[in-house]
Swiss-Prot record:
SUPFAM superfamilies listed in its UniProt record: alpha/beta knot (SSF75217)
Gene: trmD
TM annotation in the entry: none
Keyword annotations of the record: Cytoplasm, Methyltransferase, S-adenosyl-L-methionine, Transferase, tRNA processing
UniProt name for this protein: tRNA (guanine-N(1)-)-methyltransferase
Predominant localisation class: cytoplasm
Keyword Methyltransferase: yes
GO cellular component: cytosol
Gene3D superfamilies, A to Z: 3.40.1280.10, tRNA(m1g37)methyltransferase, domain 2
Task of the protein: Specifically methylates guanosine-37 in various tRNAs.
């Protein structure tokens, strides 16, 4: 049975207490995921992991050596080392699907003004590595980004989702956002569920959902809409 291993390295390991809840926690308990958390300070001298930046500037920069020690201790030849970073490649549906087939991912969660750039050069000469960005904004550290990346790809691991068909119609499949969903009651505070969803005609319902996907995607993500239209017409 395929068991993916993910290691998270951070100076705030408490961030990852959430790995024991929801679908990820269930997958972990069922033996589908091997998740391990490491405190970067354990790989440093006297717990010191940062220093002032060469060339001046605000804040502190994380030193390369503790990261190198952690990577050497945790990673193997099969590992992919991921640095969550605004300067990384954009996270996407396709990238999430690709990550789900990895045997071992090591997430290096930086803080402060970033990590000494030499760690990226050093890692790239020894292992497969990648920077990944979850959006055009800056967070206080890489922990939240690492969790978001994990949430995105574990859904593709067989056995994690109770109903695998959920993957087929969710947002970003075929470059379209998801259609609106409704549940009981049929009328809630004067707002009604669209009649077509109560009709029982599955062909019409499928057509309505696709139309709504097109409308929503064109309005909020015209870039995805253009890609979908291009691929459909090709």
């Amino acid at each position: 049975m395929f068991v993916m291993r993910c290691d998270f390295v951070s100076i705030f390991p408490e961030y990852f207490d959430v790995l024991d809840i929801s679908l990820i926690g269930k997958a972990r308990r069922n033996g589908l995921l091997d998740l391990r958390v490491h405190n970067l300070r354990e790989y440093s001298e006297a717990g010191r992991v940062d220093s002032s930046p060469y060339g001046g500037g605000p804040g502190m920069v994380m030193s390369a050596e503790p990261w190198a020690r952690a990577i050497e201790h945790i990673a193997t030849g099969e590992s992919l080392v991921v640095f969550p970073s605004p300067s990384g490649q954009p996270y996407s549906h396709d990238l999430a699907q690709s990550l789900s087939s990895e045997m071992h991912i090591v997430f290096c969660c930086g803080r402060y003004e970033g990590i000494d750039n030499r760690i990226y050069e050093w890692t790239a000469t020894r292992l497969r590595s990648s920077g990944i960005s979850i959006g055009d904004y800056v967070l206080n550290g890489g922990e939240i980004a690492a969790l978001a990346i994990l949430e995105g790809f574990v859904r593709f691991i067989p056995g994690v989702l109770g109903n695998p068909e959920s993957l087929v119609e969710e947002s970003y499949q075929y470059n379209l956002l998801e259609y609106p969903v409704y549940t009981k009651p049929a009328v809630w505070r004067g707002l009604e569920v669209p009649d077509i969803l109560l009709s029982g005609n599955h062909d019409l319902i499928r057509e309505w959902r696709y139309k709504k996907q097109l409308e929503i995607t064109q309005k909020t993500r015209p870039d995805l809409y253009s890609t979908h239209i291009y691929e459909t017409d090709s």
